[in-house]
Regions:
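Glycine/proline-enriched, intrinsically flexible loops and inter-domain linkers
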Residues: 1-47, 53, 57-358
Length: 358
């Protein structure tokens, strides 16, 4: 994902076996600060099939993302409605070394979280959640080692490439269908937002060397806003990936291959590609829904959903609660819309009601 790519491209010291970094920087592959990604490299000997060789470089990465109930900021739950600067939304983790060659840097993390302009309210909870994410990564790494041991490195890598190639071809078939329906005429949609901004998108199909591709151009979208409805670039790209994946009628794993036939144009400094340190917390949960609606509207396949994530949050220094409330989904050419469901960005389950009773 975007966070792994950002870490790989960073100037940080190279990964070592046993390392895990954590990151939530919206301007470096992230979404908003409560979403913290743990990234663990997987080192496998190049000739591991024969049982010899040295582990000198990571061949795979495993990652897990968790939405933390609180990461600091001016309100409990780290979803302030009136933030205007990123620091008001919580503590920044920009490829922080959580585990250094097997050693958990718990005190260093605690100090880092405490020195934010608006510190986290319950660091023990954050640390416990991060340990759970690390455990998930470790399980993923174990399964990768098991696969390589059973099938061999070359076979595993070949199938990983096949999964991406298959996803690319599946999306190209979707583009072919769009081309047959609309030709090369731009598919355009504009979605106004309650904050006064608007999202403009134009989707154009092109043919080069008998291969079809699509350009998704957000030129004309409003400039970044003084509020927190700005959406980081990764959020916009994720919405494009999501929409085109839903148009594929075969069960394929979601992966980067889906993006290969797609060219995404997002002007610098606009609502969907803001400049640091603009606030972004609502961009991930509100603007992302509007981006999705604009894409479905341009393609003519789905009416708009409720267009919001309906965030509900409260708390104090001891407890923090965060919930999303469901709404309606749009109709399509051959089916009706629905009510009281989670749509698009959320697709989440309800929190146990016992949490409210605490």
């Amino acid at each position: 994902g975007a966070m792994v790519q950002a870490r790989s491209a960073s100037q940080n010291s190279p990964f070592q076996p046993g390392d895990t970094d954590i990151a939530n920087n919206p301007y470096n592959g992230g979404t908003h600060l409560p979403d913290v990604t743990a990234i663990t490299p997987v080192f496998i000997a190049v000739d591991s099939a024969s049982g010899s060789g040295k582990e000198n470089q990571p061949l795979f990465f495993v990652a897990s993302r968790g939405h933390h109930a609180d990461i600091g900021g001016i309100t409990p739950g780290s979803m302030p409605p009136n933030s205007t600067q990123l620091e008001q939304e919580g503590g920044l983790l920009d490829n922080f070394k959580l585990i250094d060659q097997g050693e958990l840097r718990q005190e260093a993390l605690r100090q880092h979280l405490a020195t934010a302009t608006y510190p986290v309210r319950n660091p023990d909870q954050n640390i416990a959640d991060l340990q759970a994410q690390v455990a998930a990564n470790n399980k993923g790494a174990q399964e990768l080692h098991r696969m390589v041991q059973q099938f061999g490195l070359a076979t595993v890598q070949a199938y990983m490439q096949h999964v991406q190639n298959n996803a690319e071809q599946a999306v190209r078939r979707v583009i072919q269908q769009l081309y047959q329906q609309h030709g090369q005429s731009p598919l355009v949609c504009q979605v106004p937002m309650d904050c006064g901004a608007s999202i403009q998108v134009s989707i154009t199909i092109a043919s080069e060397n008998q291969a079809l591709s699509a350009t998704i151009d957000f030129t004309g979208t409003s400039d970044q806003q003084p509020n927190n409805f700005n959406a980081p670039l990764a959020v916009c790209k994720a919405a494009v990936l999501y929409v085109f994946r839903t148009l594929v009628d075969t069960p394929i794993p979601l992966n980067a291959g889906c993006l290969k036939p797609l060219s995404i144009v997002v002007p610098d400094g606009c609502l969907l590609n803001p400049s640091f340190p603009a606030a972004v917390v609502a961009g991930n949960v509100e603007t992302s829904q509007a981006v999705t609606d604009s894409l479905y509207g341009a393609l003519g396949v789905l009416a708009a959903s409720q267009g919001t994530m309906n965030n509900f949050t409260f708390g104090n220094q001891q407890y923090q609660y965060y919930e999303t409330i469901c709404g309606g989904s749009g109709a399509g050419p051959t089916f009706s819309g629905t009510d009281a469901v989670q749509t698009h960005m959320t697709n989440s389950r309800l929190t146990d009601p016992e949490i409210l009773e605490m």
